[in-house]
Structures are given as structure tokens and as C-alpha cells.
């Protein structure tokens, strides 16, 4: 069974159950194969009925809550992860053929080509469990060392992994790098990163309207 998953750690002031529900609606519309939609969260209130809730077990702040995605035994088979500030704009079926072991985004900005992005990730079963095991040896030390970006910690485990943009050219795009004049042809996933957040865009902005129309 394919699992599509996201993470909602409350307390940051931006993300709420509304973001989970809109992402869920986009996935439901564009993934016409059997799958579960799971949200790891510390507050399940307000989530749509079709969202399977998995409680966050640790009090790791902000983006560090993503490390719980890699908990051994949490998922079987193919896992597709999306950040909450992701807009699903087309058919997701091409991603369902991935057989592992793990795939990350290549950072969208040329000057950081050697960095990964974790706004979308794919992996099989426990293929990412090594990340969790290493992090849980000393979470406080890792959060101090990699305090600017959890992706810097995750990059150490790229190993035999793939870059998503190499596997599916043009299907996953950046709102900042690729969408200034509209949605690129064949784009299936739009990743927003940094500011402006979706809710900070003008109400008439085409991407915000597309995001709001999906639910």
C-alpha cells in the first residue's frame, strides 16, 4: 500500500489543520490509486475524516519533527512525503513506480546545488531508519550542530539515493524558481519554500487561488 504522508507540528503560528486538509484534497484528486494519507501531528483537531493521524512521539521543535517520519516500523512499502506548503497540480501516478531506496529534492537554487531539499521525499519502508537511529543517539547535539537546516543533517544519509528532479524532470517545480509567470507545462507538484507563505500571497494570485479551490 502506498502511503502519502505529511507532518504538522503546531506552535509555529503558520500551519494548521487547514493546510493538511488542502494537501489531502489535492492528493485525493490527483492520485487515483489505493493509498493511505497520513499526518504525523501533535494536534489532530479539525482534520478531514480521510486523514489518518499518527501522533508525534517526541517534542522535537519545528522542522526537526520530520525526523519522526523515519521511525523504524512506521511504514511499509512506498512512502511519498510532502511538506504542507505544497500544491498538487497534476497526476501523481508517475511517482508511484518508485522502487527505492530513497529520493530527495535537489535544492532549487543553483548556488546550493550540493544541498538536498526535504519538501518532497520518497522511500521504501525502513530505508530511512538509519537517519532516525543516528538522530536519536543525541537529538540535542544534532539540533545544535545543524541549527539552521535539518536538511544538512539528512544530507549525510543521501548514500545510494536519487534526486527527484533527475528521475522525473519537470514534474516537481519551485514556486520561486519556475512559477513566476504561471504554472509550467507538465508540472505536477509545486513546492513553496521560505517566504512568502501561501497565505501571504495576494488573494488573486493564481497559485493561491488554485490552492484554495482544491478543498
Residue ranges and their predicted role:
Residues 58-65, 149:
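A short, glycine-/small-residue-rich helix N-cap motif at loop->alpha-helix starts
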Residues 33-42, 79-86, 102-105, 163-164, ...:
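Short, hydrophobic beta-strand segments that form beta-sheet elements in well-ordered domains
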Residues 129-215:
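Catalytic core and acceptor-binding pocket of nucleotide-sugar-dependent glycosyltransferases
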Residues 1-61, 74-75, 194-197, 212-215:
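N-terminal anchoring/stem segment of glycosyltransferases
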Residues 37-46, 86-93, 151, 168, ...:
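Short, polar loop motifs at secondary-structure junctions
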Residues 45-55, 65-115:
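GT-A fold catalytic core of metal-dependent nucleotide-sugar glycosyltransferases
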Residues 71, 122-124, 191:
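Short, well-ordered beta-strand micro-motif
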Residues 92-156:
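Conserved catalytic core of nucleotide-sugar-dependent glycosyltransferases
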Amino acid at each position: 500500500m502506498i502511503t502519502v504522508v505529511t507532518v504538522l507540528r503546531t506552535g509555529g503560528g503558520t500551519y494548521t489543520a487547514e493546510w493538511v486538509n488542502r494537501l489531502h484534497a489535492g492528493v485525493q484528486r490527483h492520485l487515483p490509486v489505493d493509498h493511505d494519507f497520513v499526518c504525523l501531528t501533535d494536534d489532530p483537531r479539525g482534520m478531514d475524516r480521510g486523514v489518518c493521524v499518527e501522533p508525534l512521539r517526541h517534542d522535537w521543535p519545528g522542522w526537526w519533527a520530520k525526523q519522526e517520519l523515519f521511525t523504524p516500523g512506521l511504514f511499509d512499502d512506498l512512502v511519498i512525503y510532502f511538506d504542507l506548503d505544497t500544491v498538487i497540480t497534476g497526476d501523481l501516478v508517475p511517482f508511484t513506480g518508485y522502487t527505492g531506496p530513497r529520493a530527495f529534492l535537489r535544492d532549487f537554487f543553483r548556488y546550493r546545488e550540493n544541498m538536498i531539499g526535504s519538501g518532497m521525499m520518497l522511500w521504501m519502508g525502513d530505508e530511512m531508519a538509519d537517519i532516525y537511529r543516528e538522530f536519536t543517539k543525541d537529538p540535542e547535539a544534532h539540533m545544535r550542530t545543524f541549527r539552521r537546516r535539518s536538511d544538512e543533517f539528512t544530507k549525510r544519509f543521501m548514500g545510494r539515493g536519487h534526486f527527484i528532479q533527475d528521475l522525473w524532470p519537470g514534474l516537481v517545480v519551485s514556486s520561486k524558481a519556475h512559477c513566476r509567470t504561471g504554472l509550467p507545462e507538465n508540472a505536477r507538484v509545486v513546492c513553496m519554500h521560505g517566504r512568502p507563505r501561501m497565505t501571504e500571497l495576494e488573494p488573486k494570485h493564481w497559485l493561491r487561488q488554485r490552492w484554495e479551490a482544491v478543498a
